Amino acid sequence: MSVVTRFAPSPTGYLHVGGARTALYSWLVAKAQGGEFVLRIEDTDRERSTQPAIDAILEGMEWLGLSWDRGPYYQTQRFERYQELIDKLLEEDKAYKCYCSTERLEKMREEQMAAGEKPRYDGHCRDNPNVGGDKYVIRFRNPQDGSVVFDDHIRGRIEFANTELDDLIIARTDGTPTYNFCVVVDDWDMDITHVVRGEDHINNTPRQINILKALGAPVPQYAHVSMILGDDGKKLSKRHGAVSVMQYRDDGYVPEAVVNYLARLGWSHGDQEIFSRDELVEYFKLDDVNKAASAFNTEKLNWLNQHYMKTLPAEQVAPQLQWQFDQIGVDTSNGPALEQVVSLQADRVKTLKEMAAISRYFFESFDEFDEKAAKKHLRPVAKEPLVKAKELLGAISDWNAANIQAAINQTAADLDVGMGKVGMPLRVAATGGGNSPSLDVTLELIPQQTVLARIDLALEFIANRENA
């Protein structure tokens, strides 16, 4: 039997971290077995479902590299099929019309809660054909004896007594089918063999299994993934940082790091931390996913992100860095190749957003220096080293790191001063701040005439400081 998994988000918001992990696990199960991964948009909630949310989900999936083999399917395009099967259940007396008013149901629930009972439908219309009215819902006739048992890949054997389950509404008063019914029909029609989803769906599972059996459909295998917590042990929310997948793109994370991190968020393979996508496909097993909730650790994600920025081919990272520069309005058409910037800066930052922020001097002119760095290093004592450095740097005919370093060394030797007396003022002059990679390779990526002009700007700053 070919394995078919699915990811079935509701388009009522962005693709959040928990949903992305579920999608990844489903994708890995399919790819490991040479099966198919189906994308289904569960948009029956017409009031809350939006096209921007659908677009955000698709964008998030594409950014993570979770390509789907079939779909996206939309539940709102399948209402005829749902109605066909609802009619079938009605004809076979496996479903019935319920005319109970909202007032009656509310009163019933209040009385049940007052008596310390779990609120549930009391079956008033189940076997009462004389009840009538203009408005009705359709309820599934749930079995009243026996139990539903399924072996969850993550949680083991789970059993629900049918007496705990009331008769589920499968069609609303306006005729639209409900979530639990649509899911069942879709999983059947799309040949889904493995359902991977959040633990909040565990209570839906016995109801869905009963409907599947009533329809004569095969029952898929289930795996319910635990929730993701913040580092304080509470449910992950915006106060813990980004929860939208695309927010991580915006914040400068590479998709390889996010995929690696999400895979490890509740799953492990020995003590290995770094996984290529091929390794994830090879090693991932649902049975190895933890039952316990996982805590989101931003520091761990940052560590992974820096690892991937340093180890991925620079040409693969460069377009993502370009996107970050675009967001802050930096024109990179005049300046070094972004691959060079990536190689130079990757071990100095945790995100591409930080990399773009500290690399503006490669592409933009500036007329001010970092206040703290200038105060410390652009003092009158720095005037002579800067003048000498400008002279020797200006004499270079082949502008490269080796010749630049030789000029810096010669400046220090000619003035009989330590390298710091030359290097730090020159760094502030050339980059505008006190932090940069090694000065020789940094200056190599800045045009020679630009470096000389910036030294003049620094000398002017020192002169103004002396005259102040």
From Swiss-Prot:
| Superkingdom assignment | Bacteria
Q: Report the enzyme's class at the first EC level.
A: ligase
Q: Which cofactor does it need?
A: Zn(2+)
Q: What are the recorded Gene Ontology BP terms?
A: glutamyl-tRNA aminoacylation
Q: Which residues bind ATP?
A: 238
Annotated motif 'HIGH' region, positions:
9-19
| Recorded catalytic activity of this chain's protein | tRNA(Glu) + L-glutamate + ATP = L-glutamyl-tRNA(Glu) + AMP + diphosphate
Its primary localisation, in coarse terms, equals cytoplasm
Q: Which GO terms describe its cellular component?
A: cytosol
Free-text cofactor note: Binds 1 zinc ion per subunit.
Q: At which positions is motif 'KMSKS' region?
A: 235-239
The portions of this protein that span the membrane are: none
The molecular function terms of the Gene Ontology recorded here are: ATP binding; glutamate-tRNA ligase activity; tRNA binding; zinc ion binding
Where, per UniProt, does this protein localize?
A: Cytoplasm
Coiled-coil region: none
Pfam families linked: Anticodon_2, tRNA-synt_1c
CDD domains, from UniProt? Answer: GluRS_core (cd00808)
Q: Which keywords appear in this protein's UniProt record, sorted alphabetically?
A: Aminoacyl-tRNA synthetase, ATP-binding, Cytoplasm, Ligase, Metal-binding, Nucleotide-binding, Protein biosynthesis, Zinc
Tell me its EC number(s), please: 6.1.1.17
Which residues of the sequence carry a binding annotation for Zn(2+)? 98, 100, 125, 127
Q: Which family does it belong to?
A: Belongs to the class-I aminoacyl-tRNA synthetase family. Glutamate--tRNA ligase type 1 subfamily.
Described purpose of this protein according to its UniProt entry = Catalyzes the attachment of glutamate to tRNA(Glu) in a two-step reaction: glutamate is first activated by ATP to form Glu-AMP and then transferred to the acceptor end of tRNA(Glu).
Q: How does it assemble?
A: Monomer.
Q: What is this protein called?
A: Glutamate--tRNA ligase
Q: Which gene encodes it?
A: gltX
